[in-house]
């Protein structure tokens, strides 16, 4: 029975589940991260050779030689790395200026201390190349011995010798290139001689030898050639090596790019070594020993190959520098100048895309069944053919990857050898450095895109193949095992039978050695009763051999032994006069050749993950030690603008090419390759540190540019979506097209949550979110800043900018976790903790300093326009902040379009502006502004206006009766003109006094119009909220139908939308309270008919507390009739003044002050309750009545009567309208029902003649 698990343990186990990483749905647009799994290395370097006692002894001995040569090659690689990554130490050490310098001993001691370990390495390098040359020449001498010349030499052996030739070529070029090595040695030698470090003659001699070795160019090549030329027949062996390389290259018997380039270098350097004083390659060609025309063709196709790091070699150089080139110059085409089509990557792209598409489609079929559906777990159910298909697929994939990687490196190599100049590229400045001309200015836009695309294909396919690694590994081991066992147990059975039968002992021993080396018998041993072993035929019933199936590959030694022994059977050379090949039958030879060719790739495929990585390695695109050496210490490192990974990344960002945007992370991955290579192959921490420093800088730049682009893209998108469609079509008709932004693929990049770079996992989404949030905030800041630097009319543009930002926020929020737009807006508006924000403050500021004193209201258009004659000083505003288009409407074209739209709102303040003010200020902001406006009105009414009223009351006539009709209108006009002479001639009346009244009137009108706009907003709210509050419209009822039944049906239909019961059922107490309050507020806001304007008028009435407004109590106890002591008589006098028509070049009171002046006067009259007296006793109205009756027109004291009466008529209509509106608002609060008339009884009036009696 299972052990009991306690509840506590069970809960802790469940908690642990949270720590399990769950794969997210992030789109894969980056290469695979560095594997944390081990890459097993099954290459034993023939350490297990002695175990194969059944093998042919000679090949076991050869394996021993191979083993030591491989070790030497590894050591050579280490010296190549040492030379390539050598940075000058002597430049960093302070130099001794003169012999009298006091601290020179100390400097020399430090120099020796620092440089001694480095010079020791150089000394070891000199010894190594001596030993290597001796070893190589020893092998050549052994193989060229007269007795051994007919012997068979295996391909593996020849290729190893070829690798030696390649090593010598690389080491010599590196030694030639590195001046810093010689300089460091010289500095050390100087210091050591001064300190007498090298006393014994031997060390002096060795030091001298090292100096000569380092100073002499091509020293290694010369030594090698000298020692080879004394060996008789050395050119025959070299010809074999070169021919093998030609054969391998022709039949594509290579897998990694480095193997391909090595074959070419061995051909070139091999020919150079063969063409000397002893031998002549052209004679060998004539004897058909080598094929120079074929080599020439390959060298023409691929003129430049990578040598080491960023060092390249032109293959034709080996030919040009050979001994007999001059007299045979005409035979070579590769030495002529001119580019090979191989380097035109743009033309190659069609083929590469086709290959990529074809292979990806094929791979996807297997990938979907193996990885996605998980059927790959049932390994045992697959047939040999299915495994073979997977095996072929793996090989084909590796070959494609290798081909593309080689292609990229070859184009890069060609460009490094052929830098551009100002004639080839007009963008290239004269002052450009060598490396800059080779990288930054050396690629066209198309070439950069082609490189990016190929790199993306390489890295993308690497991901897909990496995912199937386990599937491929199993299939490869299974297929290799099956092929090896079928071949050894079944295919070789017939030739073995023939050899035994015909007593061909050598072939028999080789075949049996092969079978003993690799056969894995079903029963554990070779069947004893096999007729073939006796040279007999199989029985008629057949002899069944069951070959087992396992997923186990052969060891590296096993594979080498089998291939070498098979090769010996079909080789053209063998120790005796007659070759073994001639003793074999035709089909057998074909079988052996086929297996030998196929098994060439087994070693690579068995080490699948390592080979995959080598085929995709583009690390050399970053290394630049050769070009740094050329700067002679002027440069410690090159800037990122010259670095290939950044050049490609930046090109995508700068061009904003949509089809390339998803590839941007692949070009950044080149840094991963280089860093991995610096640590694992070069073993140099300082190179890794330099790569890391560049990555830090580049990634910052990348995020900065990408975030800016993304923000700008979505801002343009928002601006385009919100742009008036009619304007767009109108512009199109006029021939100016406002383009919609082309679609781009930022979504995939925005979904990247864990980008792998130098072993770090980076949340790209979060980094972009931070930058976009900052840009969003800056946009809002800028919109408000622009508003603060302009007048009140620009509030419509502010609203438009905020809407575009809101839309941008909405579009971006699909992919980024941004703060809420309202929270961002409040922060930009400085309205988080403060009760009112920047917009509210600026609205009031503008109202106070510009709107009230400088705008004229026109009741007909319901708009304010700027006055023609300003009375206040011009208002100074802040300078408008500068801004890039993406922080405004998105682009220059959109900025122009929107500017033209908002331009039509610039010359007035009207309903559109008030609606925006209501939306942006909200209840709180409006309350603040109105409170402040009331303070302004109070200060005016109790300040300057009161002073003018007092002053003007003093110059008013004490009594001014309304003359009788008999006097006629001209007489009455003359009478009033005379009576009001002091008022008419009062200088400040038409300026300061009217200006102050206009300010009060504008303030009143602002409050009224704001309330009207607010009502519209509230009605809109109410209608939007109605379906959620169970407020349903009455339905149409036909005759005979009942209304309540229909309404019930409607209510039940909309019940799920009714919010309050829903929240009462499902919500928390806090949510229920909020829902109820919201419901109540929405319902009651308009229903109870609250009026803000009435409250404002009531407040203003309280400001009119001075007795001068109402005058003393009437002597008759009822009202003043003829006395001029109440405000309405003063206003009548003012009205008389502004009704007088003006001259031709003068401004009317309407132009200067607008309707605000009349609103102020009428409001004061209404608030004082004098409106009816004003209507009855006004001077102008009296004149209008009389003139209407008699219809006269005269010019009295320069005043045309008819024109004046015309003006009076207009103002009477305006006054009546204003007074009616004010009356309506003031009476809105009176009790409902019939109005109560207040009646007072007075004594009937007595005529004056009777009164005295």
UniProtKB/Swiss-Prot annotation:
Chief localization: cytoplasm
Subcellular location: Cytoplasm; Cytoplasm, Perinuclear region; Cell projection, Lamellipodium; Cell projection, Ruffle
UniProt keyword list: Actin-binding, Cell projection, Cell shape, Cytoplasm, Developmental protein, Differentiation, Neurogenesis, Phosphoprotein, Synapse, Synaptosome
Effect of substituting residue 434 to K: Reduced interaction with RAC1
Modified residues (Phosphothreonine): 1234
GO CC annotations, alphabetized: cytosol; extracellular exosome; extracellular region; focal adhesion; lamellipodium; neuron projection; perinuclear region of cytoplasm; postsynapse
GO MF terms held by the record: actin filament binding; RNA 7-methylguanosine cap binding; small GTPase binding; translation repressor activity
Bridged cysteine pairs (disulfide): none
Residues found modified as Phosphoserine: 583
Keyword Electron transport: no
Substitution effect: residue 704 to D: Constitutive induction of the formation of actin filaments
Annotated family: Belongs to the CYFIP family.
Self-association and partners: Component of the WAVE1 complex composed of ABI2, CYFIP1 or CYFIP2, BRK1, NCKAP1 and WASF1/WAVE1. Within the complex, a heterodimer containing NCKAP1 and CYFIP1 interacts with a heterotrimer formed by WAVE1, ABI2 and BRK1. Component of the CYFIP1-EIF4E-FMR1 complex which is composed of CYFIP, EIF4E and FMR1. Interacts with FMR1 but does not bind to related proteins FXR1 or FXR2. Interaction with EIF4E stimulates FMR1 binding. Component of the WAVE2 complex composed of ABI1, CYFIP1/SRA1, NCKAP1/NAP1 (NCKAP1l/HEM1 in hematopoietic cells) and WASF2/WAVE2.
Note in the entry: Breakpoint hotspot for the Prader-Willi/Angelman syndromes and may be implicated in autism. Commonly altered in tumors.
Record protein name field: Cytoplasmic FMR1-interacting protein 1
Species this chain originates from: Homo sapiens
Gene: CYFIP1
């Amino acid at each position: 029975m299972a052990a009991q698990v306690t509840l506590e343990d069970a809960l802790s186990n469940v908690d642990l589940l949270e720590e399990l990483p769950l794969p997210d749905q992030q789109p894969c647009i980056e290469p695979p991260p560095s594997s944390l799994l081990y890459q097993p290395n099954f290459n034993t370097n023939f350490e297990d050779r002695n175990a194969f006692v059944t093998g042919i002894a000679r090949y076991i001995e050869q394996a021993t030689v191979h083993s030591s040569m491989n070790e030497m090659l590894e050591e050579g690689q280490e010296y190549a790395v040492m030379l390539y990554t050598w940075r000058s130490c002597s430049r960093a050490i302070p130099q001794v200026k003169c012999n009298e310098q006091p601290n020179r001993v100390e400097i020399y001691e430090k120099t020796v201390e620092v440089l001694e370990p480095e010079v020791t390495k150089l000394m070891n390098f000199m010894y190594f190349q001596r030993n290597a040359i001796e070893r190589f020449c020893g092998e050549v001498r052994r193989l060229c011995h007269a007795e051994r010349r007919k012997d068979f030499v295996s391909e593996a052996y020849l290729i190893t010798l070829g690798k030696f030739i390649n090593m010598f070529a690389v080491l010599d070029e590196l030694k030639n290139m590195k001046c810093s090595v010689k300089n460091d040695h010289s500095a050390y030698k100087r210091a050591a001689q001064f300190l007498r470090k090298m006393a014994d003659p031997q060390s002096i001699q060795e030091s001298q030898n090292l100096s000569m070795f380092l100073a002499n160019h091509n020293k290694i090549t010369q030594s090698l050639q000298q020692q080879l030329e004394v060996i008789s027949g050395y050119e025959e062996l070299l010809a074999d090596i070169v021919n093998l390389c030609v054969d391998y290259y022709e039949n594509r018997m290579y897998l990694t790019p480095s193997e391909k380039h090595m074959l070419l270098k061995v051909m070139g350097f091999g020919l150079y070594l063969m063409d000397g004083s002893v031998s002549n390659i052209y004679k060998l060609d004539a004897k058909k020993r080598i094929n120079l025309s074929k080599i020439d063709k390959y060298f023409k196709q691929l003129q430049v190959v990578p040598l080491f790091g960023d060092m390249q070699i032109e293959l034709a150089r080996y030919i040009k520098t050979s001994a007999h080139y001059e007299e045979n110059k005409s035979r070579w085409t590769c030495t002529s100048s001119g580019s090979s089509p191989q380097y035109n990557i743009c033309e190659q792209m069609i083929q590469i895309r086709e290959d990529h598409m074809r292979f990806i489609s094929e791979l996807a079929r297997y990938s979907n069944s193996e990885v996605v559906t998980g059927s790959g777990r049932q390994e045992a159910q697959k047939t040999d053919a299915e495994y073979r298909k997977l095996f072929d697929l793996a090989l084909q994939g590796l070959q494609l990857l290798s081909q593309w990687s080689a292609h990229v490196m070859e184009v890069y190599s060609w460009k490094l050898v052929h830098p551009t100049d100002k004639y080839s590229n007009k963008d290239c400045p004269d002052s450009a450095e060598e490396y800059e001309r080779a990288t930054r200015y050396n690629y066209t836009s198309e070439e950069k895109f082609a490189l990016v695309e190929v790199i993306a294909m390489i890295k993308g396919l690497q991901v897909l193949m990496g995912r199937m690694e386990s599937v491929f590994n199993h299939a490869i081991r299974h297929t290799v095992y099956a092929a090896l066992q079928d071949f050894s147990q079944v295919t070789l059975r017939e030739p073995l039978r023939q050899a035994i039968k015909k007593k061909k002992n050598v072939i028999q021993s080789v075949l049996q050695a092969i079978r003993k080396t690799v056969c894995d018998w079903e029963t554990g041993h070779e069947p004893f009763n096999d007729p073939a072993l006796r040279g007999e035929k199989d029985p008629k019933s057949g002899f069944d051999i069951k070959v087992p199936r396992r997923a186990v590959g052969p060891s590296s030694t096993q594979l080498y032994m089998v291939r070498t022994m098979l090769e010996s059977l079909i080789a053209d050379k063998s120790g005796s006069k007659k070759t073994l090949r001639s003793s074999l039958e035709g089909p057998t030879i074909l079988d052996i050749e086929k297996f030998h060719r196929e098994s060439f790739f087994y070693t690579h495929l068995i080490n699948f993950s390592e080979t995959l990585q080598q085929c995709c390695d583009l690390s050399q695109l970053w290394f630049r030690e050769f070009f740094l050496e050329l700067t002679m210490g002027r440069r410690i490192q090159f800037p990122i603008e010259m670095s290939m990974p950044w050049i490609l990344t930046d090109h995508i960002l700068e061009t904003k090419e949509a089809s390339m945007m998803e590839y941007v992370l692949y070009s950044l991955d080149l840094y991963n390759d280089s860093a991995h290579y610096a640590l694992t192959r070069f073993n140099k921490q300082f190179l890794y540190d330099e790569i890391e420093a560049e990555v830090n800088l580049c990634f910052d730049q990348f995020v900065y540019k990408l975030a800016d682009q993304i923000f700008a893209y979505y801002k343009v998108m928002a601006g385009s979506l919100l742009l008036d469609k009619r304007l767009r079509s109108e512009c199109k008709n006029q021939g100016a097209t406002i383009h919609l932004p082309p679609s781009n693929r930022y979504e995939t990049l925005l979904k990247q949550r864990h980008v792998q770079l130098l072993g770090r996992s980076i949340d790209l989404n979060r980094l972009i979110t931070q930058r976009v949030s900052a840009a969003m905030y800056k946009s809002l800041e800028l919109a408000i800043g622009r508003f603060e630097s302009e007048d009140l009319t620009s509030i419509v543009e502010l609203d438009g900018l905020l809407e575009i930002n809101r839309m941008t926020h909405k579009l971006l929020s699909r992919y980024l976790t941004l703060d809420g737009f309202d929270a961002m807006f409040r922060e930009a508006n400085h309205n988080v903790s403060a009760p009112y924000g920047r917009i509210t403050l600026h609205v009031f500021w503008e109202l106070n300093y510009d709107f009230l004193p400088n705008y004229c209201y026109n009741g007909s258009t319901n708009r304010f326009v700027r006055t023609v004659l300003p009375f206040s000083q011009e208002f100074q505003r802040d300078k408008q902040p500068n801004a890039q288009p993406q922080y405004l409407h998105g682009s220059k074209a959109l900025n122009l379009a929107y500017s033209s739209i908002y331009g039509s709102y610039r010359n007035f303040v009207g309903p559109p502006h008030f609606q925006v003010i209501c939306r942006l200020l909200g209840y709180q902001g409006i309350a603040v502004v109105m409170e402040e406006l009331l303070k302004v009105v109070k200060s005016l009414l109790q300040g300057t206006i009161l002073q003018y009223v007092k002053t003007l009351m003093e110059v008013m006539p004490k009594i001014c009766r309304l003359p009788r009709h008999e006097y006629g209108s001209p007489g009455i006009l003359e009478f009033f003109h005379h009576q009001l002479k002091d008022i008419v001639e009062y200088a400040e009346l038409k300026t300061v006094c009217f200006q102050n009244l206009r300010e009060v009137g504008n303030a009143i009108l602002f409050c009224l119009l704001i309330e009207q706009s607010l009502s519209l907003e509230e009605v809109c709210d109410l209608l939007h909220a109605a379906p959620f509050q169970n407020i349903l419209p009455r339905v149409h009822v036909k005759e005979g139908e009942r209304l309540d039944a229909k309404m019930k049906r409607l209510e039940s239909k909309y019940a799920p939308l009714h919010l309050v019961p829903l929240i009462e059922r499902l919500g928390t107490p806090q949510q229920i309270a909020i829902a109820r309050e919201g419901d109540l507020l929405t319902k009651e806001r308009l229903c109870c008919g609250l009026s803000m304007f009435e409250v404002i008028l009531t407040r203003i009435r309280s400001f009119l507390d001075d007795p001068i407004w109402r005058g003393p109590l009437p002597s008759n106890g009822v009202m003043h009739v003829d006395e001029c002591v109440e405000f309405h008589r003063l206003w009548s006098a003012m009205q008389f003044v502004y009704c007088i028509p003006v001259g031709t070049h003068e401004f009317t009171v309407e132009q200067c002050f607008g309707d605000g002046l009349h609103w102020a006067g009428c409001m004061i009259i209404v608030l004082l309750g004098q409106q009816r007296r004003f209507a009855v006793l006004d001077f102008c109205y009296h004149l209008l009545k009389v003139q209407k009756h008699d219809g006269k027109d005269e010019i009295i004291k320069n005043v045309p009567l008819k024109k004046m009466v015309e003006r009076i008529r207009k103002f009477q209509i305006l006054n009546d309208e204003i007074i009616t509106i004010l009356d309506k608002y003031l009476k809105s609060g009176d009790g409902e029902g019939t109005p109560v008339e207040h009646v007072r009884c007075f004594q009937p009036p007595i005529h004056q003649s009777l009164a005295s009696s």
